[in-house]
């Protein structure tokens, strides 16, 4: 066997391994804009883990216009008419743009019924471990609940640990972006004045 070919194959294999996308845990998926898909990685990370724990991480090595999300989607049946919380400990390193947890509730006909991506209280820069949560009401007509983490319009790295999804009491504050703006009941300014 040719020694040069063997060394090249071994080195090539190492390079491929070093550049592989981190593996997402079972049940989790990745969604990204085209630019973020090329510039960002998402998956399991043990670099900060204690006691052998795994962390979920997103890293964008260069600035992006767009987003990358790691999430999972579950059936809403068990949670209809209830208030739910997705919570995690979050750590951020040099996040330009912003990051945060995200939760989305959708009906069977794909109407958005509830949404919070922490855009009104974003995590930016370098932040040590922080307890973070999103809380939404699950409408009776809800079909699915998606929840996870997003990095938007920037670069940096963010980690999640101690993830929890649970029903909470009705008096826990829900933070939802207003999905139903007040609209006029009749057409306005059709004369373009």
Q: How does the language model describe each region?
A:
Residues 14-193:
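Extracellular and organelle-lumenal recognition/adhesion modules and their flexible linkers in secreted
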Residues 4-14:
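Bacterial N-terminal signal peptides
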